[in-house]
């Protein structure tokens, strides 16, 4: 797992270059948002279970066929698996948010997930929608914690949805 700083250093080291203005600006932005990132993580951590439960409720309200007989979240076991996965997305998105880098999502969550879901018959569309709902709820939670600029919260969730979404459709 890398954070924004180690990724930047690695890229410049591989190229054998000193930091240029872009690198310095990237570092400055990362460190300037550091306190907000930690505060956001604290707000998420203190309400993680409620955020997942609320996201699940909203998802099933929007897509009730998922919890009806024959739906992918029908039966207690499948519903629990869906909420467990949403919790994983939230936890790893929080790690990526603090790191300022989505590398942990690629390494620990996304590699092979789409193929696994397809092989198990888990619909990707509702999964993507669930992550989008989580993003909206987290932004509300973070704003409620007094963090004015919540745009940095979007990137981990947007990364998950981009990587899971259909391509070349």
Swiss-Prot record:
The modification N4-methylasparagine is found at residue 72. Gene3D superfamilies: Phycocyanins. InterPro entries: Allophycocyanin_b, Globin-like_sf, Phycobilisome_asu/bsu, Phycobilisome_asu/bsu_sf. It is a peripheral membrane protein. Contains one covalently linked bilin chromophore. The chromophore is added by phycocyanobilin lyase CpcS 1. Heterodimer of ApcE and this beta chain. A variant beta-allophycocyanin (AP) which forms a complex with ApcE, a phycobilisome terminal emitter that influences energy transfer to photosystem II. (2R,3E)-phycocyanobilin binds at residue 82. One of its GO terms (biological process) is photosynthesis. Belongs to the phycobiliprotein family. This is Allophycocyanin subunit beta-18. It is found in: Cellular thylakoid membrane. The keyword Transport applies. It holds the Pfam family Phycobilisome. GO terms for cellular component: phycobilisome; plasma membrane-derived thylakoid membrane. Keywords: Antenna complex, Bile pigment, Chromophore, Electron transport, Membrane, Methylation, Photosynthesis, Phycobilisome, Thylakoid, Transport.
């Amino acid at each position: 797992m890398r954070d924004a700083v180690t990724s930047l250093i690695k890229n410049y080291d591989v190229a054998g270059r000193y930091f240029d203005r872009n690198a310095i600006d990237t570092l400055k932005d990362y460190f300037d948002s550091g306190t907000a990132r930690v505060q956001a993580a604290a707000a998420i951590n203190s309400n993680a279970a409620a955020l997942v439960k609320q996201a699940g409720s909203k998802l099933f309200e929007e897509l009730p066929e998922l919890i009806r007989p024959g739906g992918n979240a029908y039966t207690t076991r499948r519903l629990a698996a869906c909420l467990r996965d949403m919790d994983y997305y939230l936890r790893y998105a929080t790690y990526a948010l603090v790191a300022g880098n989505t590398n942990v999502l690629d390494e620990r969550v996304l590699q092979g997930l789409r193929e696994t879901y397809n092989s198990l018959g888990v619909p990707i569309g509702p999964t993507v929608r669930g992550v989008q709902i989580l993003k909206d709820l987290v932004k509300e939670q973070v704003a409620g914690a007094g963090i004015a600029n919540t745009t940095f919260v979007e990137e981990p969730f947007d990364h998950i949805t981009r990587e899971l979404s259909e391509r070349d459709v």
